[in-house]
């Protein structure tokens, strides 16, 4: 079904009009400060890239952004969070490991947060609710861990991951892996590989993910009659690996395919199809015709 919507994409969602959480004038925990410092450092390195770069370093940064972003969407999101398909562990674990270098945290934390988002979408318990403003849902929520804990409680919704030694190992050693990787990158290519790799690559990856949490709940079109503010933003599709078909996703969250129409670019789905053709991705979930009819807008 196409984007049969009553919203032409030019209007803002009502979700942006709500009481906003105080950001600067509050108690900051050490984790908040560490996260803000890391995100700030990545963006600062990106700003320094024009003054200290090499073309091969820039290519490295773009390739890294593509690989790590695909790992986030393929592994953290569709495989681990929603269980949209199954992989053998020897393939599942490397994808989850490579997603570490998107600098978005370890699988247990990421998956837990996203499951809470779907459980409490657009409510006061949504960890990055657009009700609290664009910038809160885009990035500020990341630096307010005490508030998120108050909203959602503990990480009791990821026992399937906590029971696996590999994900506990990543949770306990994530800093070591990231520090080792970027030390090796620096020794290999020097400062340009940090400004273009960490800086450019990290900034692309960060904001690609963040725009799903913010823009895709404010602007865009609605193809399905969901009880939330989720939107599809077509032009973000290629840059977000297909994640910006967000109204499609909230309508059928277990679906391995987000770009439900042939013209809706979904790079993550193409990767899933590749592994499915090899017999490695199994139990691939898609919405049924009955599910689509239930959520379709009346014509």
Swiss-Prot record:
> Can you cite a GO biological process for this protein?
unsaturated fatty acid biosynthetic process
The source's domain of life comes to Eukaryota
Entry annotated with the keyword Oxidoreductase: yes
**Which E.C. number(s) belong to this protein?**
1.14.19.-
What are the names of the required cofactors? Fe cation
> Transmembrane ranges?
31-51, 55-75, 174-194, 198-218, 262-282
Q: Where is this motif: Histidine box-3?
A: 246-250
Coarse class of the primary localization is endoplasmic reticulum
One example of the protein's molecular function in GO is:
oxidoreductase activity, acting on paired donors, with oxidation of a pair of donors resulting in the reduction of molecular oxygen to two molecules of water
Q: Does the keyword RNA-binding apply?
A: no
Q: What metabolic or biological pathway is this protein involved in?
A: Lipid metabolism; polyunsaturated fatty acid biosynthesis
Q: Quote the protein name from its UniProt record.
A: Delta-9 desaturase-like 1 protein
Q: Tell me what organism the protein belongs to.
A: Arabidopsis thaliana (Mouse-ear cress)
Q: What is the lineage of its organism?
A: Eukaryota, Viridiplantae, Streptophyta, Embryophyta, Tracheophyta
């Amino acid at each position: 079904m196409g984007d049969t919507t009553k919203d032409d994409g030019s209007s803002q969602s009502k979700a942006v009009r709500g009481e906003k959480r105080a950001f600067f004038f509050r108690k900051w925990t050490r984790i908040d400060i560490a996260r803000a410092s890391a995100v700030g450092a990545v963006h600062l390195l990106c700003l320094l890239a024009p003054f200290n770069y090499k073309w091969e370093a820039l290519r490295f940064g773009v390739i890294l952004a593509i690989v790590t972003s695909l790992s986030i969407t393929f592994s953290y999101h569709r495989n681990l969070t929603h269980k949209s398909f199954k992989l053998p562990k020897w393939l599942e674990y490397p994808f989850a490991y490579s997603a570490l270098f998107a600098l978005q945290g370890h699988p247990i934390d990421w998956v837990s947060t996203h499951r809470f988002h779907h459980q409490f979408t657009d409510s006061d318990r949504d960890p990055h609710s657009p009700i609290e403003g664009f910038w809160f849902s885009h990035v500020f929520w990341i630096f307010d861990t005490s508030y998120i804990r108050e909203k959602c409680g503990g990480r009791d919704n990821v026992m399937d991951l906590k029971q696996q030694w590999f994900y506990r190992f990543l949770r306990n050693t994530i800093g070591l892996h990231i520090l080792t990787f970027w030390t090796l990158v620096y020794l290999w290519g020097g400062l340009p590989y940090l400004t273009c790799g960490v800086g450019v690559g990290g900034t692309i990856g960060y904001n690609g993910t963040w725009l799903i949490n913010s823009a895709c709940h404010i602007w865009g079109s609605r193809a399905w009659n969901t009880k939330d503010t989720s939107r599809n933003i077509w032009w973000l599709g290629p840059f977000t690996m297909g994640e910006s078909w967000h109204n499609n996703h909230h309508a059928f969250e277990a679906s391995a395919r987000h770009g439900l129409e042939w013209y809706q670019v979904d790079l993550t789905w193409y990767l899933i199809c590749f592994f499915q053709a090899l017999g490695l991705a199994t139990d691939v979930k898609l919405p049924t015709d009955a599910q689509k009819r239930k959520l379709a807008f009346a014509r």
